[in-house]
Regions:
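Membrane-water interface at the C-terminal end of transmembrane alpha helices
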Residues: 26-30, 127-142
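Internal alpha-helical transmembrane segments of multi-pass membrane proteins
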Residues: 23, 27, 56, 80-101
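Transmembrane alpha-helical segments of multi-pass membrane transport proteins and ion-pumping complexes
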Residues: 34-46, 72-80, 109, 129-134
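Membrane-interface elements of multi-pass transporters and channels
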Residues: 44-56, 84-89, 138-142
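Short, Lys/Arg-rich, polar N-terminal cytosolic tail immediately upstream
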Residues: 1-23
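Hydrophobic alpha-helical transmembrane segments
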Residues: 24-32, 65-69, 94-98, 119-123
Length: 142
């Protein structure tokens, strides 16, 4: 007697027995790329004379990278939760991501006193979102 077992859709093993984690890999790669891009934009803006300071405190370049990567990880966790417990995960993730992008831009618009810093902070948010959201949305269940 022969028994055929269909491969699991949630865990795909390779020939070496290792498990594939496409959402984890996508989250890390998108987070690193977005963090580098946001930091580069901040560095270019600072070199061009944008103060990048809030209440007299300079925003460290590492802060751009850290917070961007944290945002990517949170996005990956949201996709994982939606894939597990929700129907139409992709659509719901896109709505949640759009709302979080808007909310995350509020301090960028309200805190810095100068327009150049505000524009730079919003630009880094939008650039990071443009990199992270499509990558994670592709990993969300349709």
């Amino acid at each position: 007697m022969t028994v055929t077992v269909a491969p699991s859709a949630t865990s795909i093993g390779s020939t070496t027995g290792r498990r594939s984690h496409p959402l984890l890999k996508a989250t890390v790669v998108a987070g690193l790329v977005a963090a580098a891009a946001a930091t580069a934009v901040a560095a270019v803006a600072h070199a061009a004379g944008v103060p990048l300071a809030i209440d007299g405190e300079q925003i460290p370049f590492l802060g751009f990278a850290q917070m961007t990567f944290v945002g990517a990880v949170l996005g990956g966790l949201i996709v994982a939760a939606l894939n597990r417990w929700s129907g139409r995960a992709r659509q719901r993730f896109q709505v949640i991501a759009a709302a979080l992008i808007v909310v995350s831009c509020v301090p960028s618009v309200s805190l810095p006193p100068d327009t150049a810093t505000k524009l730079t902070l919003v630009a880094t948010h939008l650039l990071a979102a443009a990199i992270i959201v499509p990558v994670l949305a592709r990993r969300a269940a349709p």
